[in-house]
Amino acid sequence: YTLIYSVLIFTCLSCQQQTPQTQIEQTAIDFCEAFYNFNYTVAKEWSTPSSQSYLSFLASNVGQTHLEQLKTRGAAKVSVISSEIDANLEEASVVCQIKNAFVIHPIGGKMEYVSSLQDTLELVRVNNKWLIRKDIPQQNGKQSHD
């Protein structure tokens, strides 16, 4: 009987819907883990259509030396600092802390190691799925090094 109850409880728990807060935070983590580990193909899956060309451009700047340096240092680690969803549940923002990260500068392709940085991600709801809107960065403090 305990096995039946265990299966029943597990089934009920797994059927519960994630809250919008949990959804946006998990989407942000999944995106950042892919983005800061140069896995732009996966990052595109979590991105708006308007972000695709920017991610393709970044992917074209990744060379074998970048991948080797990433492999030597290890994967970037991502955590959520804060998140906010607008009242109508159509837009959100998540501030992530990324540790052990490499940043490739779009102009020139120079790679820089950053022990810790924050990235503010803008999310929009498209067809009932949260997606990251990541376009060419502005010099407005949206991405800041600690």
Model-inferred region functions:
Residues 20-21, 69-72, 107-111:
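Intrinsically disordered, low-complexity segments enriched in polar/charged residues with Gly/Pro
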Residues 8, 76-79, 117-119:
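Short beta-strand or tight-loop elements
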